[in-house]
């Protein structure tokens, strides 16, 4: 304000914090894995080229997963080959970004769960960066992506999609 009775005065907003670009990748590829070792999820990645080296990348992940039995699924986020926002292994505990467990009885192989998480990353580059997620499961289990574990042909099972959004936030 410039004083009582005067019209309001406005100042320009600060330059930082603006969204410069948004890249979204949807993945409807149905796949599965039965590995206790982390492996890339087929078709699940997004690439973005920051316009400035001090930009941050805000990432939103959602994964539609199923498990074939009462077990655990573990997920690690990556920028290229660098693990981001993930714990390290500790003794027999598995380090991961997020995890999912199923303990819901015999009909759970007809169900999917959406695993969602966000990360703010500082890649410090103007080169293209690719973000992926790797998954692993407890020994003897199978994780399914974008379908239920048994993929029954009935009105109770789903075939959802997964996706990643990458937003460049200017400094």
Predicted regions and their residues:
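Short, solvent-exposed loop/turn segments enriched in Ser/Thr/Gly
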Residues: 40-42
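Glycine-rich, low-complexity segments
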Residues: 1-30
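Acidic-glycine-rich active-site phosphate/pyrophosphate-binding loop
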Residues: 37
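Terminal beta-strand-rich extracellular "head" domains
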Residues: 25-26, 32-34, 49-128, 132-171
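Extended, low-complexity regulatory regions
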Residues: 44-48
């Amino acid at each position: 304000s410039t004083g009582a009775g005067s019209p309001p005065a406005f100042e320009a907003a600060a330059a930082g914090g603006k969204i410069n670009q948004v890249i979204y990748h949807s993945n409807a590829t149905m796949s599965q894995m039965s590995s206790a070792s982390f492996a890339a999820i087929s078709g699940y990645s997004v690439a973005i080229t920051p316009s400035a080296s001090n930009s941050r990348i805000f990432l939103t992940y959602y994964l539609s997963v199923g498990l074939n039995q009462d077990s655990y699924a573990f997920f690690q986020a990556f920028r290229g080959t660098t693990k981001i926002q993930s714990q390290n292994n500790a003794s027999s505990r598995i380090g991961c970004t997020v995890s999912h467990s199923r303990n819901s009885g015999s009909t759970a192989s007809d169900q999917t769960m959406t695993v969602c998480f966000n990360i703010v990353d500082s890649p410090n580059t103007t080169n293209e960066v690719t973000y992926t997620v790797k998954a692993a499961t407890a020994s003897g289990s199978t994780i399914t992506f974008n379908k239920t574990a048994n993929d029954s042909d009935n009105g109770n099972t789903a075939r959802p999609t997964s996706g990643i959004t990458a937003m460049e936030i200017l400094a």
